[in-house]
Swiss-Prot record:
GO molecular function: aromatic-amino-acid transaminase activity; histidinol-phosphate transaminase activity; pyridoxal phosphate binding
Protein name: Aromatic amino acid aminotransferase
Alphabetized UniProt keyword annotations: Aminotransferase, Pyridoxal phosphate, Transferase
Stored PANTHER family: HISTIDINOL-PHOSPHATE AMINOTRANSFERASE, HISTIDINOL-PHOSPHATE AMINOTRANSFERASE 2
Residue pairs linked by disulfide bridges in the UniProt entry: none
Family statement drawn from the similarity comment of this UniProt entry: Belongs to the class-II pyridoxal-phosphate-dependent aminotransferase family.
InterPro entries referenced in this protein's UniProt entry, alphabetically: Aminotrans_II_pyridoxalP_BS, Aminotransferase_I/II_large, ArAT, HisP_aminotrans, HistidinolP_aminotransfase, PyrdxlP-dep_Trfase, PyrdxlP-dep_Trfase_major, PyrdxlP-dep_Trfase_small
Functional summary from the UniProt entry: Aminotransferase that catalyzes the conversion of aromatic amino acids and 2-oxoglutarate into corresponding aromatic oxo acids and L-glutamate.
Gene Ontology biological process terms, A to Z: L-histidine biosynthetic process
Length: 358
């Protein structure tokens, strides 16, 4: 090929999604087992009547729905539509946030291991990823603070953390945000927040209101079950939202995805009630794995993390032989999605047999 490409791209790997194998149980991509509600299906079908038209590039109706939804849960006037940005999944908003803050020579801090897209997007922007090792499978916030330099522009906090399933203590997160210099953007990536239970639920939107440099990311892919439609949103200071609009790819969230998201907001209580079923299965699977002899951190997500180290690849290979597709992370461990009960049973049967082998 004679085209002159950016040479630095040669050293950047492509993002690797969870595999799909026909006939196998896929527990690799943290998808919900539930399909869309009838009301959401109806909204999707109705939206197909206008496929000859461009989608609303300003996401006006969706942003108004989101603002009203936040008002309902947080109190009147919590956020305005001008404080909400919509993207083609929260992953696209991650990229936009990097674009508006960081360029060559700048630094972006995040825990590691964490969401695999962070280092790829940072390097693509020409910036430098600063990976801070996890402590006990969760964010080491003190070490992340110590990693801040005069070149730091952005910090990602993936909470709950993907792939290790853990959550940051809310009080510790508040202290961390207060300690970060106000010119550095702190992005709290909450793709799995709906699965957090007990006193670990963060007041992330309160942090946005108290600190103009804090951004919260949410997605419709997980608890809302719209992974195939790719739509997410950010809640932030209005100036940040305006900047995000300057690096946004026009029309990237379709009319269908917007209609489905609006209908999902209207049915939020019913959809979020489904997470209780996932949490119950998560607790059952966790207890069974520990009883079988596995060591794993407490999960606050819709998946569990098995830190298998050098045994990771053998576990993945043998799982595939048993028609189970799980997600490996090098020689660190395996992420396993909480699925339907019968699928979880199949996985547990395999896991018990595997750990019992010499």
């Amino acid at each position: 090929m004679t085209a002159r490409l950016r040479p630095e791209l040669a050293d950047i790997p492509a993002y690797t999604p969870g595999k799909t194998v026909p006939g196998a149980i896929k527990i690799a991509s943290n998808e919900t087992v539930h399909g869309p509600l009838p009301s959401v299906r109806a909204a999707i079908e109705k939206a197909t009547d206008q496929l000859n038209r461009y989608p609303d590039n300003g996401y006006l109706e969706l942003r108004e729905h989101l603002a009203s939804h936040l008002d309902k849960n947080l109190g009147a006037g919590a956020f305005t539509p001008e404080q909400i940005a919509v993207g083609c999944g929260s992953v696209s908003l991650c990229q936009q946030l990097i674009q508006i803050t960081s360029s060559v020579g700048d630094e972006v801090i995040f825990a590691w291991r964490s969401f695999e897209i962070y280092p790829l997007q940072v390097r693509t922007a020409g910036a430098t990823p600063v990976q801070v090792p996890l402590r006990d499978h969760t964010h080491d916030l003190d070490a992340m603070l110590a990693a801040i330099t005069d070149r730091t522009r952005l910090i990602f906090v993936c909470n709950p953390n993907n792939p290790t399933s853990t959550v940051v203590d809310p009080a510790a997160l508040k202290r961390f945000v207060e300690a970060v210099p106000p010119h550095i953007l702190v992005v709290i990536d909450e793709a799995y927040v709906e699965y957090i239970r007990g006193d670990q639920v963060p007041d992330s939107f309160g942090l946005v209101r108290a600190h103009p440099n804090v951004v919260v990311l949410r997605t419709f892919s997980k608890a809302y079950g719209l992974a195939g439609l790719r739509i997410g949103y950010a809640v932030a200071d209005a100036d940040i939202v305006t900047a995000l609009g300057k690096v946004y790819v026009p029309f990237s969230a379709t009319s269908i995805s917007q209609a489905a998201a609006i209908a999902s907001i209207d049915a939020a209580d019913e959809l979020l009630a489904r997470t209780d079923q996932v949490v119950a299965e998560r607790d059952r699977v966790t207890a069974a794995l520990r009883e079988a002899g596995f060591t794993l951190p407490p999960s606050q997500s819709n998946f569990v993390w098995l830190p298998l180290a050098e045994r990771t690849l053998d576990f993945v290979r043998r799982a595939a032989e048993n028609r189970l597709v799980v997600r490996p992370y090098g020689e660190d461990g395996v992420r396993v999605t909480i699925a339907a009960p019968h699928e979880n049973d199949a996985f547990l049967e395999f896991a018990r047999n595997w750990i019992g082998q010499p």
